[in-house]
Every structure is written in C-alpha cells, then in structure tokens.
Amino acid sequence: MNVGTFARRRVDGTHPVDEWGLDADVVALVAPLVGLRWRVEAHWPERVPATGPAVLVHNRVLGLSEPVVLARGVHRATGRPVRTPGLVDVAPIATVGRMLGAVVDRPDELTGLLRAGHLVGLPLGRDLPRRAGPLAAAALAPALATGAAVVPVALVGSEVGRRWRLLVGEPVAHPDGRGPLAVADLVDAARAGVQALLDSATDHLAGLP
C-alpha cells in the first residue's frame, strides 16, 4: 500500500477496521519495515486451517520477536492475520496495539475472536531455546468451547538474528468432554506437539545467523 492511498482512506473514513480494532491498512503499511528486521521461512503452512478458527500454540524465549515472527510468517504463507494476546489495555498503547492485531488476554475476548473465525497466537511460557515452556491449565478452554483447531508451532531463531524459521505441526485432536480435565489434556498435547517440532528442528537450525 502506498502512502497516498493510506492517507486518502484516513480522510474519507473508508479504511477497514474490524470489531477488535485491527486496521488492515496500518498492517500493510508497516509490513515492509517488519520485513527489513525479520526474514521468516514457513514450513508446512498448509497445516494452518485455510478458514475457520484456530489457536496457534508456539514457543518463546524472551517473547519479543516471536509474536511478530508468527504473525508475519503465517500471514505471508496463508494470507490470514494472527491475533496476538497480551495487549496492555491502556491508551494510547492499546489503540496502536489493536491496529496491529494485538488483543487483551481475556477468555471472553479470545472466545469472541474464535467464534468469529480468527487465528489466535498463544505463546507458551518463557523457557530456554528449543524447550516448550509451561502453559496454564485453562489456557485452551476457549478453543475447546468453540471447537477451534489447536495447532502447535515451533519458532526457531535468535533475537539478535534476522532469519527465523516457522515450523507448523499437525492440529491436535480434541479430547472427549468439555471439563477441566479435557482442557488440561488438550494443553498437554499442544505442548508435546511444540516440543516434538523443536526436537526435530536440528536441521532447521543450521545456518541461522
């Protein structure tokens, strides 16, 4: 998108903004700048559902690059935006964050996004590289409640490097039932899927700066 088109849409009020504040024009405008900082190579992106809701459970170390890497890699490979929980709900940070796809990490907001058919990136807890961190037992309750696909994703790269690889696993089967034990089983299966991708990523690590 060129700056002229961006400015014209601002003036005439035709810029697209969804219910949660995502501004597609802003995302398109900053995408080239993001590409200068992060080069993302996606492997098996066809495992991300082409339509409908899904939770992309991914690893993180510091958690600075990973949400951007996930969103950029998935969007370039599939054309689908990824919503990122963890937004600080304080203006003006919240306004800018929502324009770029961030959302507040609340069950009602995540459930609403999934019911509307969006992709949501859900980070595991911070841990060492190549290790899947913890995830709260109830974190995937919105996915189970809405029937959303749960897809493990491994992000392989370095905060100081530019090159990242994004490895997408097979969607995790939903357990029977809808109670706390079923949610905990889904969390365990998602973490195991991420860890399996990280364990198999040795070849993908070769050559990373």
Please tell me what each predicted stretch does.
Residues N2-D25, T111-P209:
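Non-catalytic C-terminal accessory region of glycerolipid acyltransferases
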Residues G21-D23, V27-R60:
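Helix-to-loop junction immediately C-terminal to a conserved catalytic motif
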Residues L29, I93, E109-L110, A139:
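Residues within well-ordered alpha-helices
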Residues A31-W38, G97-A102, P129-R130:
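Short, flexible loop segments at the rims of nucleotide/cofactor-binding pockets, characterized by
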Residues H43-P45, D105-L113:
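Short, charged beta->alpha transition segments
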Residues W44, H58, G86, L124, ...:
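Pocket-edge structural micro-motifs
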Residues A50-E109:
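Catalytic core of membrane glycerolipid acyltransferases/transacylases, capturing the structured
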